Curated annotation (Swiss-Prot):
Belongs to the FAM227 family. Disulfide bonds: none annotated. This is Protein FAM227B. The gene is FAM227B. It comes from the Eukaryota. Residues 1-22, 485-508 are annotated as: Disordered. It comes from Homo sapiens.
Length: 508
């Protein structure tokens, strides 16, 4: 009120003709109204009541309370599914209880006689309902060398059996297990490898290669090749499109391994014939048939078939190459060394009484890491490759059946393919160089220690040896300079002689 009175007085003094300016900011307005002390703290009479109400409002407006309210009151579309799920759980528990009552061992058979009968029936089924594996014993009266085997002749409607009753399926399984495929991949590849077309490919390819290397017979080889082509096309068409690339990247290599394993298993006495050259020729032939390209040289190095020299494809041990007398002598020596021992000597020096590890076992225990030659690498060249060409086996099949459109096929584009022209010559590997450097370093250290000990005892003698060594180096350097000078003088005189030779050649 006092503020209003003062304002009225000021306005009356100023006169009617002069107006006061309005406030330009909130501060001026508050000061003009005499409210510059606002806002003041507001005190409610019932503070506890207000705080309780505020807390309740916060709780009611929280996410949990809103979600709970909606869950309890809003009707849901998937409520029928929840009811169905709860009923299924209930019924599954009832079914489990019911089955546990049915298959109780005591209610099914008695403890003694019925159980023994069941065991006998199980053994009988295992014995007669499992597919038999033909184990080749040493007492079999079949020939174990190439000389005692012959091709019985091509039959159009029947595959020629492999020698010594070998089973193609077991050979394929042996090769697949050696690759250590993943379990899921192994099951997929197994169905394709053991298909009828793949089995026929192994039979006919083995006999074709047998005739080609040891019993040349053009007529039978041609008949076998015709069926090989048909079997390969059948196998190619049976593989799903999504698996074709992956399968036919490994199939030629696996087929070559299977043929090699068949030769090794069928003719153990002729294993010396199946050397690295034999593997190289066999693999090149199979790869060229399937894809038209040769594999990398030495592709067979990754084959895990070294154990074929000691074990069969079924895992049974082969007879050792030693004679009976040698084996008896070795066994007697081993028994005598193992029986005659002194426990006190063994405890004092246990290393002297440990059995030595054979070279073969030590070689297998260590992982062989490849070391490259320290010389230059392989030489490469560029060859033309038909990018749209067919596999030779498939192309032969198309020509053999004279399918329409083969001769009218458009010309395919060719690309340049990098190929190894020549492998590097055998030379010391980097591992050999490192070993030799370590040996030389050890020798240098030994010589240095000897020289150091000699210098402390006989310094004058060491000084004389050092002077002799320097004199030897100077003389060798002088001889080398003289040789270089003589070579340079002879090279400077050589152009004239070559010119004369060229002139005589032109006159002639």
């Amino acid at each position: 009120m006092a503020g209003q009175r003062t304002c009225q007085r000021r306005s009356s003094r100023a006169g009617p003709g002069k107006m006061q300016e309005p406030p330009k900011s909130i501060e001026e307005f508050l000061k003009f109204q005499n409210w510059d002390y606002w806002p003041r703290e507001i005190h409610f009479r019932d503070d506890d009541k207000w705080s309780c109400t505020l807390k309740k409002i916060k709780e009611d407006s929280s996410f949990v309370s809103i979600y709970t309210h909606l869950w309890e009151n809003v009707p849901r579309i998937f409520e029928a599914l929840l009811i169905m799920e709860s009923k299924l759980k209930e019924y599954s528990l009832i079914l489990q209880n019911h089955t546990s009552e049915i298959f109780k061992w005591k209610s099914m058979i008695s403890e003694t006689s019925s159980y023994r009968k069941l065991e006998r029936y199980g053994e009988f089924l295992k014995k007669y309902h499992k597919k038999k594996k033909i184990m080749l014993s040493d007492e079999m009266e079949t020939e174990k060398n190439i000389e005692g085997c012959s091709f019985t002749g091509f039959k159009a409607n029947e595959l020629t059996q492999l020698p010594r009753h070998l089973d193609a399926e077991q050979i394929y399984l042996f090769i697949l297990k050696a690759h250590n495929f993943d379990e899921r991949v192994f099951k997929i590849w197994k169905t394709h490898f053991l298909s009828e077309a793949s089995i026929a490919l192994l039979h006919d390819s083995f006999w074709w290669w047998f005739l080609h290397k040891f019993r040349p017979d053009r007529e039978n080889q041609d008949c076998l090749f015709d069926r090989i082509s048909e079997s390969y096309v059948t196998l190619f068409m049976s593989i799903p499109l999504s698996r074709k690339d992956a399968f036919f990247q490994i199939y030629p290599d696996c087929l070559a391994q299977a043929i090699y394993a068949t030769f090794h298993e069928a003719f153990p006495e002729s294993s010396y014939l199946f050397n690295d050259e034999f593997k190289e020729d066999l693999g090149n032939n199979i790869f060229l048939w399937c894809s038209g390209l040769k594999p990398q040289k030495g592709f067979w190095i990754h084959w895990k078939l070294k154990e074929l020299s000691t074990t069969t494809i079924h895992g049974s041990k082969k007879a050792p190459a030693k004679s009976v007398k040698e084996r008896i002598a070795d066994s007697q020596e081993h028994i005598s060394t193992s029986i005659d021992f002194n426990i006190i000597k063994i405890l004092n020096n246990p290393r002297a009484y440990t059995l030595p590890i054979s070279k073969e076992e030590s070689r297998l225990s260590r992982l062989a890491t490849k070391s490259h030659y320290s010389s230059t690498g392989p030489e490469f060249n560029r060859v033309l490759f038909n990018f749209g060409g067919q596999s030779p086996l498939i192309l032969y099949y198309l020509k053999m059946h004279e399918l329409a459109g083969i001769s009218k096929a458009p010309k395919k584009t060719k690309i340049k393919l990098t190929k190894i022209f020549q492998e590097p010559l055998p030379a010391p590997t980097y591992r050999d160089v490192i070993k030799e450097a370590k040996r030389q370093f050890a020798r240098n250290q030994k010589d240095f220690r000897i020289l150091q000990a000699k210098a402390t005892k006989k310094p004058h003698e060491v000084k004389q040896d050092f002077e002799k060594f320097l004199h030897k180096l100077r003389s060798e350097a002088e001889i080398e300079r003289e040789c270089v000078a003589s070579l340079s003088s002879s090279s400077s005189s050589s152009p004239s002689s070559t010119d004369n030779y060229n002139f005589e050649e032109e006159e002639y």
